[in-house]
């Protein structure tokens, strides 16, 4: 009997219902401040349809609302693609669906679009978002597929009149700490675009040699401190300390750069973290191999006179796209390619700082 009373008291103390007691109603935690900082606190920003005023205020400040992605170079893309009603198009990187939505508007309910994405989390949200805007399966086909496999889509769809590939990571992926893309917030060191496939960045670091890691940092992000960072990471893991969170990697990089003059240290750590995370993301997602495959197959999915625009966000991607377009133009496969990159306007960069590193290149099928 005494034991039963103890158990009953324990239940009361822990908030669990006793046998003759109704379950305790727990209110959800509410953010009490006026300036939400964490991803979870920014619940209004993650519901743009419900809190349009909040979204507009965030954008006006030059920030990207949490859980959203502001499409880049929309006007430049549409001006080049010259989409006409009745055409067939492909958005090879669906993401938040902003570019797809604008291209669908150009079709004026005539023709069809296909859109691809590897992210199983965001693709569900984007499909629903576009469906609610009136873009259902009669005008839009969405597939969870890596854009390296565009040849599989053309078997079903036929040749495309226009293709877009935006190679950037979407803001909603970067901003969600659970995805582990950003060094600014604590989260698992994952960096996979599809968390259901492959190994995380944390797992990758457990098995990589110093030489291989240094080479990765150089090739994927031109990291000037590649030797020091790779040595520190490998030594830390050899000591039995896992680097399995974004914060652990950021703190280790900070220690490596401790000898940099104090007035330069903060910016140096920020830039080095950006480059290191980028290099790891490219590696775990095989981004260069995927891009090689896409560029190689691209001419075979374009109709005669078909147009393709590609947005890149770092020099490694841009070099691959430029080289492919120029080589295929010399081979007579493309009739025209962009001589130079197209960049977002200063106004767009002020409105959306994440657009600053964007470069756009285009090609037309002969």
Swiss-Prot record:
Keywords: Cytoplasm, Methyltransferase, rRNA processing, S-adenosyl-L-methionine, Transferase. Its EC number is 2.1.1.199. It is found in: Cytoplasm. S-adenosyl-L-methionine binds at residues 97-99, 117, 147, 166, 173. Residues 1-46 are annotated as: Disordered. It is an enzyme of class 2 (transferase). One of its GO terms (cellular component) is cytoplasm. Residues 25-37 have a biased composition (Basic residues). One of its GO terms (biological process) is rRNA base methylation. It catalyses: cytidine(1402) in 16S rRNA + S-adenosyl-L-methionine = N(4)-methylcytidine(1402) in 16S rRNA + S-adenosyl-L-homocysteine + H(+). It comes from the Bacteria. One of its GO terms (molecular function) is rRNA (cytosine-N4-)-methyltransferase activity. HAMAP family: 16SrRNA_methyltr_H. PANTHER family: 12S RRNA N4-METHYLCYTIDINE METHYLTRANSFERASE, S-ADENOSYL-METHYLTRANSFERASE MRAW. Specifically methylates the N4 position of cytidine in position 1402 (C1402) of 16S rRNA. Belongs to the methyltransferase superfamily. RsmH family. This is Ribosomal RNA small subunit methyltransferase H 1. It comes from Lachnoclostridium phytofermentans (strain ATCC 700394 / DSM 18823 / ISDg) (Clostridium phytofermentans). The lineage of its organism: Bacteria, Bacillati, Bacillota, Clostridia, Lachnospirales. The gene is rsmH1.
